[in-house]
């Protein structure tokens, strides 16, 4: 199992990450589609080749072709939106908030899977990318759809752990050169 290989690669100084990786993925209460879509989207967002290589096959095996594509779409569209909306939010000139975005985001309206799942994946990727405005927006949509806080927190816990593991393993790879 790739998850076990990934856990084994985490150095002892980051043992907490190893344990967290096992618990947030291996013991998650999320339905399989929500879990593995979150894992795949966050692995892509982490920008860690090792993490993506290790987790993608298991995600693909646990997702329908439509969900697999939608999770990748969530990572792709949020890569754009998180930069755009975070920048708009951080600029001190509020006029930028009144301007038309002018960016295509059709996949958000028609993701090919349940809207709640796509929103959850988008929230998790927004956590990795640090866009507060996007986090608030996706959290509100999820809450209005009846998703509880525990489920939402589960998604951003997965995001946090995958990001941390990616950072750690990428650093170790550079230090080993």
Curated annotation (Swiss-Prot):
GO terms for biological process: cell redox homeostasis; response to oxidative stress. Belongs to the AhpD family. Signal peptide: none annotated. The active site is at residues 131, 134. Keywords: Antioxidant, Disulfide bond, Oxidoreductase, Peroxidase, Redox-active center. Homotrimer. The gene is ahpD. It holds the Pfam family CMD. It catalyses: N(6)-[(R)-dihydrolipoyl]-L-lysyl-[lipoyl-carrier protein] + a hydroperoxide = N(6)-[(R)-lipoyl]-L-lysyl-[lipoyl-carrier protein] + an alcohol + H2O. It comes from the Bacteria. Antioxidant protein with alkyl hydroperoxidase activity. Required for the reduction of the AhpC active site cysteine residues and for the regeneration of the AhpC enzyme activity. It comes from Streptomyces avermitilis (strain ATCC 31267 / DSM 46492 / JCM 5070 / NBRC 14893 / NCIMB 12804 / NRRL 8165 / MA-4680). InterPro entries: AhpD (IPR004674), AhpD-like (IPR029032), AhpD_core (IPR004675), CMD-like (IPR003779). Its EC number is 1.11.1.28. The keyword Disulfide bond applies. The keyword Oxidoreductase applies. It is an enzyme of class 1 (oxidoreductase). GO terms for molecular function: alkyl hydroperoxide reductase activity; disulfide oxidoreductase activity; hydroperoxide reductase activity; peroxiredoxin activity. This is Alkyl hydroperoxide reductase AhpD.
